[in-house]
Swiss-Prot record:
Pfam families: PPR, PPR_2. This is Pentatricopeptide repeat-containing protein At1g71210, mitochondrial. It is found in: Mitochondrion. The lineage of its organism: Eukaryota, Viridiplantae, Streptophyta, Embryophyta, Tracheophyta. GO terms for cellular component: mitochondrion. PPR repeats lie at residues 181-215, 216-246, 250-280, 285-319, 320-355, 356-390, 391-425, 426-460, 461-495, 496-530, 531-565, 566-597, 602-636, 637-667, 671-705, 706-740. Its main location: mitochondrion. One of its GO terms (molecular function) is mRNA binding. Keywords: Mitochondrion, Repeat, Transit peptide. Residues 1-44 form a transit peptide.
C-alpha cells in the first residue's frame, strides 16, 4: 500500500510545487504526444540499439537474475501459479479428468477470497477461468457466492463474451448447486446487470420485490453501478433512493454517484459532491476521488486534476493511494515520460505517491512501445536499487528489453533460467524472443522456444508462427517446421491465419510432397486458409509424383475456395491426369464436368481440355472432347479448331491433321490462322514439302502468310540445303514490304558460316539488290560469313553493319563473338563489354564462346613461352 500523506502544510506545498514542475517540464512533450501515439501493441520487428549508458548485457543478466531470484513471493502466489499451470496444460481430446485429478491432489482449502484471487490471476485466460470456476462449484464444502459470480461475470464481459454470459443466465442452470448460499433471483439481477442488460435485471428485481424479496447491499450496488455504465439515469435515482432508505449508503455508493456525474459530463458537480463529503466522510471522498481524477485526465485537464489532488491532500484525512495511482497512470499514458529518470526523481519525494510494482511495470511497457531503451533501463535499475519486489510482468519486461536491445544471448539465458528464478514467460515475451532469435538466424533455438510455448499451451498468433516456420524453411530445415505444425495442431494451437507461410512450398521443393499434403490436411482440419501459392505448390508437387488424381482434387478445391488457376497450371493438371497409367478417363471426366458446371463460357472449358490432352500426347482424347462440343450443342470456335489441329500436329498424327483440315475446308472454316498453324506444325514435324504446298495454297487463296510461316520454312529449307528456295522466300518476304527479321537474318548468316551455298544462291538472285538497295549489305555479310569476300569494317564493329539489315539480338552477338574468337581471340572480351554497354545480357552460350577464347589464348602463350625458352637454350649452347 502507498504511504499516507504527511499532515504538515510545508510538505504539502513542496508536493504541489513538484507536481506542477512535472507538468510544466512535460508540457512540450505532451503537445508532441497528442499527434504521435497510435497504438498499444509493441512492434516485434523494431530493434533499437541501446546507448552507451546501458551496462553490458552479461552484467545486466547476472544482476537482474539475482534480483528476480530474491523477490518476495508469497506462498499463496506460488500455489496460484501452480493452479494456473495445471489449468493451462493441454487436455487429451477434450477429456478434463486429468486436470480435475491434479487440482484435487493439491488439497486446496477453498474460500471465497482464495477463489477470487485465482480468478483475478487467471482473468486474461478465459478458458482457465471457466475451468476453475466449474471445478470449484463441484467441490464438497464450497459454494459460489455473489462475489465469485460477480467476478466471473466481470471477466466474461471484459473479454467481450457477453453472449456467452447471457446464454448462461437465460438457462439459469449454473446456479442449481448454489441455491443454499446464493438465491437464484439475486444472481440473475447481478448477472444481467454486469452483462449490461439492465432492462432484464430490473425486471428480475421487480419480480423479487413483488414476492417480498430484496437485494442485499452488494446486489444493490452492482445494479446501481450497471445503471450508470449503461447511462440509465432515470432508473438510477429510483435505485439510489432504495439504497438510502435501507441505510446501505457507503463509500461505494459515493464513488458510483461521482461516476454518474462524470458520465453526465458534470465534473464541477462531481467535485462539489466530493468536497461536501470531506468533513464527515473522508473514506467516501477517497473512493470517488480517483474516478474524478481519471475523468479530468481523460479530458486533458491535468492542471485541474493536480489542483484537486493538492487541495484534498491538505485535509490530511483522505486516503490518496488510488487517486495518485490513477493520476500517475494518466501522466504515463499522455506521454509525460520522455525523461523517466527525471520523472521518478520528481515523483519520489511526494508522500502518498510511492509507486507500486504494477505502476513501474506500466511505465516500462509504455517505454518499450516507444523504443526508449534507456528509459526502460533507468526504471528497472531504479526498482532494483529501491528494493521493489519484481513480479512476473517485471521479468517479462526485462526479457523484452534484452530482445529489443539486441542482447540475444542474455535474453536466451534469462529464458533458460525461468525455473531457477520462477519466471513464467507470457505470450508477448515468447513472441519477442522468437522474433529476435529468427532475426539473429538462431532458428534452432527459436524452434525450441516455440515448441516450449506450445507445450505450455500458449497461443502465439499467425505472425510469429509464420516467421519461425519460414525462417526454418529458408535455413533448409523444413522437417523442423513440419514438426512444429504437427505439435501445434495436436494441441489445437495452430493459428487460423498464417500469412505467407512457406512450409508447403519448401517441402515440395525438396521432394517431400507427401509431407506437404499431410501438412495441408492438418491446415484444413484446423481451419487454416490455404493460400493460392500453397495450392500451386501442392499441385505442381503432385504432378511431379505423377499423381494426377491428387492434382485434380486440389485444383477443384482451389476453385471452390475462390481462387482462379492460371491456364498453364490447369493445362499441366490435365496433362498429368491424361498421363496416368490407369483411371485417366474417370478423373479427366470428373474434372471436365466440374469445370463445365463452374464456367459460364463452356467453350473455354472444352478448349482447355483439348489443349491439355494434346500436350499429354493424347490426340484421341482431345478429339473426344472436341466431338462432345457438337453433342452438347456448342459450335467449336476458331480457337477450338486450332487447338485440335495443333493436337494432331504436335503428336505427329499428320494424316489425321490433313483429314481434319480437309473437313474444315469443306465446311468453309479454313481461316488464315488455321493455315498458319498447319504450315508451322508441318515444318516442325519435318514435313517441308507439305508445308510449302500449304504456303502456296494460302497465297493462292489471297491470304498473306504470317512472319512465322516464312521463318520456319526458310529455316527448314536451309537445314535441307535448299538455299535457292530459301533465298527466293527471303526475296518474296522482302518484296511484301516487310523488313528482314532477326530470326531470318540469323538463319542466313549461321548457314553461311557452315556452307558457301547460301552466298552462291544469293549471287544468283542479283535482282534483289537492284530493287531493294539495303539488301546489298546483307549479301555482303553473307559473303563475309562464308569467307568469300573481305570487308573493311573491323569484326568487333560489324554489329553496326548488321543493324542496318535487321534488328540485333543476343543470338546475333554470339555469332559475331564466335567469328572474333576464330580470327582475333584477344578482342573477345572487348566485344563482350560492347555487348553489355548496348544493353544486351550475355547468356550461357556467350560463356562457352569465352571459354574457347581463353583456351586459344592460353595455347598461344604456351607456344610463345616454349619458343622463347628454346631460343634462349640455343643461344646458351652457341655461347
Amino acid at each position: 500500500m502507498l504511504r499516507c500523506w504527511s499532515v504538515t502544510v510545508e510538505r504539502s506545498c513542496e508536493g504541489m510545487l513538484l507536481r506542477r514542475r512535472i507538468l510544466s517540464l512535460s508540457a512540450s512533450s505532451f503537445r508532441n504526444f497528442t499527434s504521435g501515439n497510435n497504438g498499444d501493441a509493441i512492434p516485434f520487428s523494431t530493434f533499437t540499439k541501446p546507448s552507451s549508458s546501458i551496462a553490458p548485457g552479461d552484467f545486466l543478466v547476472r544482476e537482474w537474475k539475482d534480483w528476480f531470484k530474491h523477490r518476495d513471493v508469497k506462498q499463496s502466489h506460488q500455489l496460484i501459479d501452480r493452479i494456473f499451470d495445471i489449468l493451462r496444460a493441454p487436455s487429451n481430446d477434450g477429456d478434463d479428468r486429468a486436470f480435475y485429478l491434479h487440482l484435487s491432489n493439491l488439497r486446496l482449502r477453498l474460500t471465497e477470497k482464495f477463489v477470487l484471487d485465482v480468478l483475478s490471476h487467471t482473468r486474461y485466460d478465459i478458458l482457465c477461468c471457466l475451468k476453475f470456476f466449474d471445478w470449484a462449484a463441484r467441490q464438497p464444502g464450497f459454494h459460489h457466492t455473489r462475489a465469485t459470480f460477480h467476478a466471473i461475470f466481470k471477466i466474461l464481459r471484459g473479454a467481450k463474451l457477453v453472449t456467452l454470459m447471457i446464454d448462461f443466465l437465460d438457462r439459469s442452470v449454473g446456479f442449481e448447486s448454489c441455491r443454499h448460499s446464493l438465491r437464484l433471483c439475486d444472481a440473475l439481477v447481478v448477472g444481467y446487470a454486469v452483462a449490461g442488460r439492465t432492462d432484464i435485471a430490473l425486471q428480475h428485481f421487480g419480480n423479487m420485490r413483488f414476492r417480498g424479496l430484496d437485494l442485499d447491499s452488494f446486489g444493490y450496488h452492482v445494479l446501481l453501478n450497471a445503471l450508470v455504465e449503461e447511462k440509465c439515469f432515470d432508473s438510477f435515482d429510483v435505485i439510489f433512493d432504495q439504497i438510502s432508505v435501507r441505510g446501505f449508503v457507503c463509500a461505494v455508493t459515493h464513488s458510483i454517484l461521482v461516476k454518474k456525474f462524470c458520465k453526465q459530463g458534470k465534473l464541477d458537480e462531481a467535485e462539489d459532491y466530493l468536497r461536501a463529503l470531506l468533513p464527515n466522510d473522508p473514506a467516501g471522498c477517497g473512493s470517488g476521488l480517483g474516478i474524478l481524477v481519471d475523468a479530468l485526465c481523460s479530458k486533458r485537464k491535468f492542471q485541474e486534476a493536480t489542483k484537486l489532488l493538492d487541495e484534498i491532500k491538505l485535509v490530511g484525512t483522505v486516503n490518496m493511494d488510488r487517486a495518485y495511482n490513477i493520476w500517475i497512470r494518466a501522466l504515463i499514458k499522455a506521454g509525460f515520460l520522455n525523461n523517466p529518470a527525471d520523472f521518478l526523481q520528481k515523483i519520489s519525494p511526494l508522500e502518498g505517491c510511492e509507486l507500486e510494482v504494477f505502476r513501474y511495470n506500466s511505465m516500462v511497457f509504455q517505454l518499450l512501445k516507444e523504443n526508449n531503451l534507456d528509459g526502460v533501463y533507468d526504471i528497472l535499475t531504479e526498482m532494483m536499487v529501491r528494493g521493489v519486489s519484481p513480479n512476473k510482468k517485471t521479468m517479462n519486461a526485462a526479457l523484452c528489453f534484452f530482445c529489443k536491445a539486441g542482447f540475444v544471448d542474455e535474453a536466451l539465458e534469462l529464458y533458460r533460467s525461468r525455473s531457477e528464478i520462477g519466471f513464467a514467460p507470457t505470450a508477448m515475451s515468447y513472441n519477442y524472443l522468437i522474433h529476435t532469435l529468427c532475426a539473429n538466424e538462431s532458428v534452432e533455438q527459436a524452434y525450441d522456444v516455440l515448441k516450449g510455448a506450445i507445450d505450455r499451451g500458449h497461443f502465439l498468433g499467425g505472425k510469429t508462427f509464420s516467421t519461425l516456420t519460414n525462417a526454418l524453411c529458408w535455413k533448409g530445415k523444413p522437417d523442423m517446421a513440419r514438426e512444429l505444425v504437427i505439435a501445434a495442431a495436436e494441441r489445437d494451437l495452430l493459428p487460423k491465419r498464417i500469412a505467407g507461410c512457406k512450409i508447403i512450398s519448401a517441402l515440395c521443393d525438396v521432394g517431400k510432397v507427401e509431407d506437404a499434403l499431410m501438412i495441408n490436411e492438418l491446415f484444413n482440419k484446423s481451419g487454416v486458409d490455404t493460400s493460392f501459392k500453397m495450392f500451386t505448390s501442392l499441385i505442381y508437387g503432385s504432378i511431379t509424383l505423377m499423381r494426377g488424381d491428387i492434382a485434380a482434387k486440389l485444383i477443384i478445391r482451389m476453385q471452390e475456395k475462390g481462387y482462379t488457376p492460371t491456364r498453364s497450371l490447369y493445362r499441366n493438371v490435365i496433362q498429368c491426369v491424361c498421363e496416368m497409367e490407369s483411371g485417366e478417363k474417370n478423373f479427366f471426366t470428373t474434372l471436365l464436368k466440374f469445370q463445365l458446371s463452374l464456367w459460364e463460357h463452356k467453350v473455354q472449358a472444352y478448349n482447355l481440355f483439348i489443349e491439355g490432352a494434346g500436350f499429354a500426347g493424347k490426340p484421341k482424347l482431345a478429339r473426344l472432347v472436341y466431338d462432345m462440343m457438337d453433342r452438347d450443342g456448342i459450335t467449336p470456335t476458331v480457337a477450338s479448331n486450332i487447338l485440335m489441329l495443333q493436337s494432331y500436329l504436335k503428336n505427329e498424327k499428320i494424316a489425321d491433321a490433313l483429314h481434319f483440315f480437309h473437313d474444315l475446308r469443306e465446311q468453309g472454316k479454313t481461316k488464315k490462322r488455321l493455315y498458319q498453324v498447319m504450315i508451322v506444325g508441318l515444318c516442325k514435324a519435318n514435313k517441308l514439302d507439305d508445308a510449302m504446298h500449304f504456303l502456296e495454297e494460302m497465297k493462292g487463296e489471297g491470304l498473306q502468310p504470317s512472319i512465322e510461316c516464312y521463318e520456319v520454312n526458310i529455316q527448314k529449307l536451309c537445314n535441307e540445303e535448299k538455299y535457292d528456295e530459301a533465298v527466293g522466300l527471303v526475296n518474296e518476304f522482302r518484296k511484301s514490304g516487310r523488313r528482314i527479321t532477326a530470326f531470318i537474318g540469323n538463319v542466313l548468316l549461321h548457314n553461311a558460316m557452315k556452307s558457301k551455298g547460301v552466298y552462291e544462291a544469293w549471287t544468283r538472285m542479283r535482282n534483289i539488290e537492284d530493287k531493294i538497295p539495303e539488301m546489298k549489305s546483307l549479301g555482303e555479310l553473307i559473303g563475309l560469313f562464308s569467307g568469300r569476300i573481305d570487308m573493311e569494317v573491323e569484326l568487333k564493329r560489324l554489329d553496326e553493319v548488321i543493324e542496318k539489315c535487321y534488328p540485333l539480338d543476343m543470338y546475333t552477338y554470339n555469332m559475331l563473338l564466335r567469328m572474333i574468337v576464330m580470327n582475333q581471340a584477344e578482342d573477345a572480351y572487348e566485344m563482350v563489354e560492347r555487348i553489355a554497354r548496348r544493353g544486351y545480357v550475355p547468356n550461357e552460350r556467350t560463356d562457352m564462346i569465352l571459354e574457347r577464347a581463353n583456351r586459344i589464348l592460353e595455347e598461344r602463350n604456351s607456344r610463345s613461352n616454349l619458343g622463347r625458352n628454346g631460343w634462349n637454350s640455343r643461344q646458351r649452347q652457341l655461347e
